[in-house]
């Protein structure tokens, strides 16, 4: 995975930083639900690049080219259009570094088999290759199914929250453990539903 800095040039005559931040956070959310960026805590800041005022952010991406427009889904493009209407134009990104603490992304995005897997410690796609257990970027398989990709991220967040609670061992430990270990729990049923839907798409 890679640490990347996207830049949005500010071309609006009037600055409403609150509104502009909300629009850019909408882009961040859609990038995240499409699997183009990983994680939820994304720093957003005003900066200058090549003499142009604008906004930048620091994100973790599964691949060097994750933020290229061809990887966008319809929801990402809509969020980008809303930002552009307010004078925020995506100018591109620079690769800062290879993230040495992150998992390596799967080289084959269409393996013979794959699985859903996550833990409270993981910061990567919950879709893993059956061949080498590497995470597969969601946009590689689900770009045309944004609702499914977002649902998968929400499932991962719920699973990780339960895993964290049972690891902490003080609050809701039994209930959380049941959710991630019982075959007929809500989380397990949701995971099986998602696996079946992903199988249809891939």
Named regions from a protein language model:
Residues 1-202:
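Intrinsic low-complexity, intrinsically disordered or marginally ordered coil/linker segments
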